Amino acid sequence: MIRPVFAAALVLVGMSSIAAAEDTLVVYFHQRPPYSARAADGGVHGITADVVTQAMSVAGVPYRWEELPSARQMEVIKRDEMPACGLGWFKRPERETFAKFSTAIYHDLPTIVVARQDDARFAGMPSIDALFADKTLTLLTKTGYSYGAELDGKIAAQKPKARADASDNQIMLGMVSRARVDYMIMAEEEAKDLLARPDLADAKLAIYHLANPPAGEYRYLMCSKSVPDAVIARINQAITPPQ
């Protein structure tokens, strides 16, 4: 027979474990080097992931990484079933209606274009407006993805010839290489990381800089409404402001 005192202790331990689990902040990420990726040591590393890891440690906020596609991250954060944050999101007015945002964790480099090395239409430093106006070019975009306020506005207003795809960027760059589409737009640090991979070594793709390129966007933690303001404040104090 379990003695009453021992049974009570077991209950308290169980309740403590549940409380600890509930107090652990879930931080969602998806495989997107150089921003975030699961490493061989089991941890999550990258430009934005490392900033958050350091901030959580300094702030003393218990957390755990959980891999989830970006579209699912937004759904879960909207539902607000538990305290959770998504890594590296752009801040948008429509997102602020259902989420809280940390201070900025990273500032992207200016936008560039990735296209085939032998495509003369990208020679020199074309403007993004000229590329969008050229109906012989097909832009490849990621389904449900924001390219920043300026580019989102230009895409909506100028309606360039475009095709959307939900694949990861490495697969999408393969589509550019095979001439199924003509170009993608992305931050320069991401493009450099992708083009350095062995899988794209023979892709014959190049980075093209733009005349008057859109400034790089700031990235944030996008959190569900149930994340306490006090927790976000602690995280904010521990984040080193990006340049």
Q: What are the residue ranges of the model-derived segments?
A:
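Extracytoplasmic small-molecule ligand-binding "clamshell" domains
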Residues: 22-98, 165
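Periplasmic-binding protein-like
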Residues: 29-33, 108-110, 200-236
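N-terminal signal peptide c-region/cleavage motif recognized by signal peptidases
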Residues: 14-18
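Ligand-binding cleft/hinge of the Venus flytrap
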Residues: 52-61, 132-136, 141-166, 195-202
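Acidic, polar ligand-binding/catalytic clefts
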Residues: 66-133, 209-214
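Short coil/turn segments
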Residues: 31-33, 40-45, 116-121, 136-147, ...
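Short helices/loops that flank or line small-molecule/ion binding pockets
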Residues: 71-84, 100, 169-192, 197-198
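Extended ligand-binding regions for polar small-molecule ligands
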Residues: 46-59, 117-125, 129, 217-243
